[in-house]
Structure formats: C-alpha cells, structure tokens
Curated annotation (Swiss-Prot):
InterPro entries: Acyl_CoA_acyltransferase. Belongs to the acetyltransferase family. The keyword Transferase applies. The keyword Acyltransferase applies. Forms a complex with cognate antitoxin TacA. This is Probable toxin TacT. Keywords: Acyltransferase, Plasmid, Toxin-antitoxin system, Transferase. Probable toxin component of a type II toxin-antitoxin (TA) system. Might acetylate tRNA and inhibit translation. Should be neutralized by cognate antitoxin TacA (y4aR). Coiled coil: none annotated. It comes from the Bacteria. One of its GO terms (molecular function) is acyltransferase activity.
Amino acid sequence: MANTGAAKRIIEPLDPNRHDRAAFFCGIIQVDNFFKKTANKLSKADNLRVYVMTEDDGTTVIGFYAINSHSISYADLPERFSRTRPGHGSIPAAYISMIGRDQRYRGGGYGGDLLTDCLQRIAGIADQIGIAVVLLDVLVCGDEEKTSRRVALYSEYGFQPLPSMPLRMFLPIATIRSLMG
C-alpha cells in the first residue's frame, strides 16, 4: 500500500465546528448528502466514525471516509475463506460505509490515500479486536461505466466480490497486513 504520490495530508476525525462540509462537492448526490447532512449525526450517535483529509488550512475538506463495525455470515464468503470459520453465525467485519473526494482534487491521488489510510486504520483496530474482513458496497449512481471503474479500483486494492452479491466486496484483514509489511 504505497503512497500514491499526493502530498502527505493530515487525516483526522470529523470536527463539524472546524471542517467545512458545506463546500464539499464530489458530484455524487448520495455521497455529498451523506457528508453534508448525515455523517455528523451518525457519528454523534456512535453508529460510525468519519475521518477527513484536509488542506493545510485545516478546514477545507479534500475527502473523507466513514467506517463502522459489521458482520457477515461465514456462508457468504467464498469457500476458500469460509472453511476456517465456524459452521454457524457470523464473523466480525469492518465496513467502509462511504468514501468521497472533492472534485477539485481529482487526479491528485487523494482517493487512493484515503482508502489506504482507511485500511491501515482498520488493520490497527483489528490488532485490538477481532476483525476478519473489510466490507464495502460499490456505489451505484446510475452510470454503469462509473460503477465498473469503482469495482476496478477496489479490485486493485485486493477487494473481491462476494459470490452472492457482486457489488459487495471484501478484503481479508490478513491481506491488508501482508500488504502493509
């Protein structure tokens, strides 16, 4: 998980009093609405945590991601991953519930930096509590080409589609650890 070349930026928890959510615009209605209207509420309710990458001014948001705990039935994973799991119930997972980058920063490698930071943060959490996989749902915005590009991007990071739900992707925590070296 090498740095994608963008200048190193600080990624920190969302502070609604300091981080300018109103100016954020990624161009995808679901992502923009989530960040502007929902992210802080869900964070305050302890449903998820939001992390933002900012400009040097500490207020201009370049991008963000939101994570929370989740679980997945062992039966939903491909056989080679589920064979070491219990024969019943669910296994612990981390869920990337949303990730977005402001359009003004397109092409700077910031999206990759956000995803890398997210996966590193989850790996750190997995050192303290049990997490077997990371899950995410590929955003469907009505444009098949954009959806395909998102699938390809996540695949480059090692995510694989679940057999029963191809737009839900997973990445074993062991893979993240091996990539981090």
